Amino acid sequence: DCQGKVEDYSGFVGRTKSYAAYVCVAADMLSLALLAPPGEWGADVAVGNTQRFGVPMGYGGPHAAYFACTEDFKRQIPGRIIGVSVDKHGNRALRMALQTREQHIRREKATSNICTAQALLANMAAMYAVYHGPDGIRDIAQRAHDMAAALHESLKNAGYKLTNNHYFDTLRIELPESQLADIREKAEAAGINFFYEKNAVQIALDETVTDQDLHEIGVLFNVKLTTST
């Protein structure tokens, strides 16, 4: 969730389905290399951002989104859907399979009347996935989690109150306002960005974080890392 907790939503989804409602999930793509994907626990639609797949932050954008759904909704999807087919020589080929909701097909019933696209960013993210492959993506995700786990263990051993014991790459630490202000001042002076609440700080450790970065974060909290990746 927005505080870094990893929760089991399968029960919630099951109850929702009993009321004939649909479930849409916003999910971090990289986390899904380690976590059960939304489709496995009953979500109808999954959406999110592909920035973590090799696309620079770019001051917050632009980034390509991803959108996935069950077969039940495939004819309601805006845009052009590419499918796998076979060419006249019997070779595997990609072709345009569905464009049901495109403007030139349905016009007044079209759902694709948004005239912007992030094709370049989508291609960058796709090629990042192709370059690393499933095992490589899983290794990248595991490394980010291992970094978070090392920091979590060190902070917990030092007596800090962490509110998320199940996490992927983001930790939330509750602190008194005075201590929070002190850490924020030192972090900003060191060029380290955290997310601050009134009485808590959140730390996200992504695939770019190094052992040195982790050490510098430990210095801010006056802890020594118990584990190194």
Regions found by a protein language model. Give the residues of each.
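Conserved PLP-enzyme active-site core in the AAT-like
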Residues: 1-93, 155-159, 172-173, 185
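Generic recognition of stable, solvent-exposed alpha-helical segments in well-folded globular domains
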Residues: 4-7, 11, 25, 29-33, ...
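Active-site C-terminal subdomain of aminotransferase-like
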Residues: 52-158, 162-165
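Short amphipathic beta-strand starts and helix->beta connectors
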Residues: 151-159, 185-196
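Conserved PLP-binding catalytic core of the aspartate aminotransferase-like
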Residues: 158-188, 205-208
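Conserved PLP cofactor-binding pocket of PLP-dependent enzymes
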Residues: 165, 190-202, 228
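Short amphipathic alpha-helices in soluble, non-transmembrane regions
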Residues: 182-190, 216-221
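Flexible inter-domain linker/hinge segments
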Residues: 211-229
